Amino acid sequence: MKLSRRSFMKANAVAAAAAAAGLSVPGVARAVVGQQEAIKWDKAPCRFCGTGCGVLVGTQQGRVVACQGDPDAPVNRGLNCIKGYFLPKIMYGKDRLTQPMLRMKDGSYHKDGEFTPVSWEQAFDVMEEKFKTSLKEKGPEAIGMFGSGQWTIWEGYAAAKLFKAGFRSNNIDPNARHCMASAVVGFMRTFGMDEPMGCYDDIEQADAFVLWGSNMAEMHPILWSRITNRRLSDPNVKVAVLSTFQHRSFELADNGIVFTPQSDLVILNYIANYIIQNNAVNQDFFTKHVNLRKGATDIGYGLRPTHPLEKAAKNPGSDASEPMSFDEYKAFVAEYTLDKTAEMTGVPKDQLEQLAQLYADPNKRVISYWTMGFNQHTRGVWANNLVYNLHLLTGKISQPGCGPFSLTGQPSACGTAREVGTFSHRLPADMVVTNEKHRDICEKHWQIPAGTIPAKVGLHAVAQDRALKDGKLNVYWVMCNNNMQAGPNINEDRMPGWRDPRNFIIVSDPYPTVSALSADLILPTAMWVEKEGAYGNAERRTQFWRQQIKAPGEAKSDLWQLVQFSRRFKTEEVWPEALLAQKPELRGKTLYDVLFATPAVSKFPLSELKEEQLNDESRELGFYLQKGLFEEYAWFGRGHGHDLAPFDDYHNARGLRWPVVEGKETQWRYSEGNDPYVKAGEGYKFYGKPDGKAVIFALPFEPAAESPDNEYDLWLSTGRVLEHWHTGSMTRRVPELHRAFPEAVVFIHPLDAKARDLRRGDKVKVSSRRGEVISIVETRGRNRPPQGLVYMPFFDAAQLVNNLTLDATDPLSKETDFKKCAVKLAKV
């Protein structure tokens, strides 16, 4: 057997990922032997991050027994990261939930009762009573839902439809608010449309990669393997990595830059200044395709209105901007000189110049990648806008090998949270609830009365916590996330509301997470291939999978829960008389009848499917629910730049990147010859904007909401590690991954540890103004903070790092800044 170069790279990438985690790859991933004939294989996208790797799932006797990279998947080309190889084991933790659990005392629900098994009928009875009471006494604003970028497309669509049209409440938001909201607002402000214009195929054609606040080596390892291949294949290819601390991605970097927290804004403006001063502006592109605007400043930090920082802000929450000339923009960025930038960021001048030269060189095709370092930022929208500026000044955009690319952290943060519109302000296909025309489009398509969808933006994630604490939000359904562990400022703003006797909290989850154990009712949920699903990844690729096994016990999919619960409400119980008068034929009908059993949704018969293609929900309802929901949803985007292919095409493909027009997917948007919406002769057209032009924004540096001082003298940054995903509710139940990284640690500079009489392995108390945790000192290893900063992962339920974090958000995106708050350390 000959080992090809590709095989060599692939084998080494697998080995590297496994070695990094301190474990070996499962045998089935190396070579599926022995019982191979008895295993049934089918395709699915990976359950974890937003990369969207394709895997082959092996099932036998009703269980997932094997998993391997799908060699026909264009994203990963047969390679998995170490989490992907252990996918089968995430479903079989010993504490998997299999029946509803309600807090009960003396035979009935009680806020302080013990969790007791109940039937679905009993669970829904209690939920129904709580929902109806709140709706009757306080109205739709008293109920809410916190959803997920891990929802399938039709689960998110059903949830949004049920809440916004059925319950008439926009108080539904996804956990993608915590990770991708800044990217969404950044895209909308600059381009008028959401999501990247490029794709992963850019990697093999780029000359330079710049990572802004993104540790791709651990968080997007498959894409990192492709970047590594590209970098090692051509000595002229360069990699720059920017972060507030060193991590594994620095190992490949030609220019590894550690900067002072929040000063990335300074670096971005410096590069724009460098481009202009060195006559590197692509004048032809700039003149034809770009407008300039100056944004409002001093916009606050998304804290409560009574907070001193909010009271001091001149323009709290302002998204305003005004036109400006090129000369005015030139003068604006001219303040960000090399000397000033080096002083404010702590970055050596030669490194700053090297970075700027990558963008300024007209012969270098540059990709900018970023994730949470940019997005989880009190000026995250600005950071997104400022990196777009660099690509718009140079014209390095919407062409193979160059462009700005926001990487997602969840498997369907794009396909579900963003495209479906499960945010509190959004509707499908980039429409918003505040736009009367958009509401009208949805109401007519859904055949519900005009005025059903509220015009008021609902509560975003952090606002939901505050409303629960204040007693304004009283019934709260949490699905497919673990926000009690993942959200900020647990002690002050979340736990009080969850345990308030006025409130009733439902958590749908496969496992007894921190969130589930803090709730009043736990609903057991089907996972991954226990249901039919669809995800949309970071490169606009929509991928489907079939249900391949049944969920254990009485566990049900989120879709089943939403649809079945809708049967409990008649239109008269949720809609005012003025709405019913418009459509009297809807009187007496349930929300199930009006939203999910409509002719549009129920028109696809099960006779279209083979026996092995049926799923549990469709069997129970008698029609192909998933297809009906998808086709109804896809209508919104077709002909409007968000075109999705017909439903059946996705089951036959390894994903398709929208817009899909006349059967052809789109790799690069907004450019002639690549995007079907750009006509011959237009060159580029940013058609999300009325005039087809993108916007360069002039936005300054503004400080973080909280910085170290004499008492709390260290920056805290939080994040993830390779072996665990988010709060670890799945990966910590995989023995091999748990052993590889069993508990969270505090990564700290050796000199900072020495100054506090701390040694590696010591127990340490980490305290902020909001709370404290006990952890373990780590002065070596993969993450190497500079002096003055510590880093902690948030996967460990025994170390709730978000007891420490501040609930400051970007005022425009409402996304939390998990990367910057002040802490102190004390030896235990």
UniProtKB/Swiss-Prot annotation:
Predicted to be exported by the Tat system. The position of the signal peptide cleavage has not been experimentally proven. Keywords: 4Fe-4S, Electron transport, Iron, Iron-sulfur, Metal-binding, Molybdenum, Nitrate assimilation, Oxidoreductase, Periplasm, Signal, Transport. GO terms for molecular function: 4 iron, 4 sulfur cluster binding; electron transfer activity; iron ion binding; molybdenum ion binding; molybdopterin cofactor binding; nitrate reductase (cytochrome) activity. GO terms for cellular component: membrane; nitrate reductase complex; periplasmic space. HAMAP family: Nitrate_reduct_NapA. It is an enzyme of class 1 (oxidoreductase). Catalytic subunit of the periplasmic nitrate reductase complex NapAB. Receives electrons from NapB and catalyzes the reduction of nitrate to nitrite. It catalyses: 2 Fe(II)-[cytochrome] + nitrate + 2 H(+) = 2 Fe(III)-[cytochrome] + nitrite + H2O. The keyword Signal applies. This is Periplasmic nitrate reductase. SUPFAM superfamilies: ADC-like, Formate dehydrogenase/DMSO reductase, domains 1-3. Gene3D superfamilies: 2.40.40.20, 3.30.200.210, 3.40.50.740, Dimethylsulfoxide Reductase, domain 2. Binds 1 [4Fe-4S] cluster. Binds 1 molybdenum-bis(molybdopterin guanine dinucleotide) (Mo-bis-MGD) cofactor per subunit. Coiled coil: none annotated. Component of the periplasmic nitrate reductase NapAB complex composed of NapA and NapB. InterPro entries: Asp_de-COase-like_dom_sf, CT_Nitrate-R-NapA-like, MoPterin_dinucl-bd_dom, Mopterin_OxRdtase, Mopterin_OxRdtase_4Fe-4S_dom, MopterinOxRdtase_cofactor_BS, Periplasm_NO3_reductase_lsu, Prok_molybdopt-oxidoreductase. Substrate binds at residue 794. Belongs to the prokaryotic molybdopterin-containing oxidoreductase family. NasA/NapA/NarB subfamily. One of its GO terms (biological process) is Mo-molybdopterin cofactor biosynthetic process. Its EC number is 1.9.6.1. Mo-bis(molybdopterin guanine dinucleotide) binds at residues 83, 150, 175, 179, 212-219, 243-247, 262-264, 372, 376, 482, 508-509, 531, 558, 718-727, 802, 819. The lineage of its organism: Bacteria, Pseudomonadati, Pseudomonadota, Gammaproteobacteria, Enterobacterales.
